[in-house]
């Protein structure tokens, strides 16, 4: 038996609104739920999604990080020499 006066009120027929229209009813602790997107107007679920990938993700990643290899190797060398010097001073 649940404890009295600690549970929120349950609304078995709570209305879900999207753009001012009732799109569905669900059970909730709120009588009305206002949403911006739901499965009825989301591009993925309606089939109107357009994927525009002018450059592949792998190619973009390789191009981005291949430029940084030359500059990144200099900073790695200076860090490694500093750490070796610091260990010998103890």
UniProtKB/Swiss-Prot annotation:
Gene expressing this chain: rpmE
UniProt feature, compositional bias: Basic residues: 76-90
This protein's UniProt keywords: Ribonucleoprotein, Ribosomal protein, RNA-binding, rRNA-binding
Subunit structure: Part of the 50S ribosomal subunit.
Annotated region described as Disordered, given as residue ranges: 65-90
GO cellular component term of the entry, any: ribosome
UniProt-listed InterPro entries: Ribosomal_bL28/bL31-like_sf, Ribosomal_bL31, Ribosomal_bL31_A, Ribosomal_bL31_sf
Protein species of origin: Trichodesmium erythraeum (strain IMS101)
Signal peptide start and end residues: none
Family: Belongs to the bacterial ribosomal protein bL31 family. Type A subfamily.
GO annotation terms (biological process): translation
Name of the molecule in the record: Large ribosomal subunit protein bL31
GO molecular function: rRNA binding; structural constituent of ribosome
Gene3D superfamilies: Ribosomal protein L31 (4.10.830.30)
Record's function text: Binds the 23S rRNA.
């Amino acid at each position: 038996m649940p404890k009295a006066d600690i549970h929120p009120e349950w609304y078995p027929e709570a209305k879900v609104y999207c753009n001012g229209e009732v799109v569905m009813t669900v059970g909730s602790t709120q009588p009305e739920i206002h949403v911006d997107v739901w499965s009825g107007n989301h591009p993925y679920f309606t089939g109107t999604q357009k994927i525009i990938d002018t450059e592949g993700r792998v190619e973009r990643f390789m191009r981005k990080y291949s430029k940084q290899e030359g500059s990144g190797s200099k900073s790695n060398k200076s860090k490694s020499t500093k750490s070796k010097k610091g260990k010998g001073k103890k």
